[in-house]
Curated annotation (Swiss-Prot):
NCBIfam families assigned: Cytb6fFeSPetC, PRK13474.1
One GO cellular component, as annotated: plasma membrane-derived thylakoid membrane
EC nos: 7.1.1.6
Protein species of origin: Microcystis aeruginosa (strain NIES-843 / IAM M-2473)
Keywords for this protein: 2Fe-2S, Disulfide bond, Electron transport, Iron, Iron-sulfur, Membrane, Metal-binding, Thylakoid, Translocase, Transmembrane, Transmembrane helix, Transport
GO molecular function, a single term: plastoquinol--plastocyanin reductase activity
Function per UniProt: Component of the cytochrome b6-f complex, which mediates electron transfer between photosystem II (PSII) and photosystem I (PSI), cyclic electron flow around PSI, and state transitions.
Protein name as annotated: Cytochrome b6-f complex iron-sulfur subunit
GO BP annotations, alphabetical order: photosynthesis
Amino acid sequence: MSQVSGTDVPDLGRRQFMNLLTFGTITGVAAGALYPIVKYFIPPSAGGTGGGVTAKDALGNDVIVSQFLTSHNAGDRTLAQGLKGDPTYLVVQEDKTLANYGINAVCTHLGCVVPWNASEEKFMCPCHGSQYNAEGKVVRGPAPLSLALAHANVTDNDKVVFSTWTETDFRTGEEPWWS
């Protein structure tokens, strides 16, 4: 292997070095600033068939279906921690089984948590008076949309797992606005 003489090595002048340094700095800052903007516009990937979030009770414990159903009556709607940490109602059906859907408790008007009013059998928002029927369909505004749904599946180890609802909304017959 032969040695390269000093005259054959290209000389990086001061001006070229400063241009390279300036270009590198501007590129780094621009990439750092654009990253969150680009990430915002790229939708999150789907959870897949096995994906989901285990429902948690008010104390942060996993919801065990057999224990849950013994302590709740038919028609009950009970809050659990659901997808993205949102409060989500578990629904006990008339035959004392758990419904295969959960109802997100966040009001579609301004984001208040909507409590279940058992005596009137509907969800009533305390902030601005929006009302939803027992399935979470809006019946009185100012809320523009029904409450979001999530699948509530029972696993082999008797726990509830919430997953994203992407099918047609059975209450309205329309595509889900939340997916």
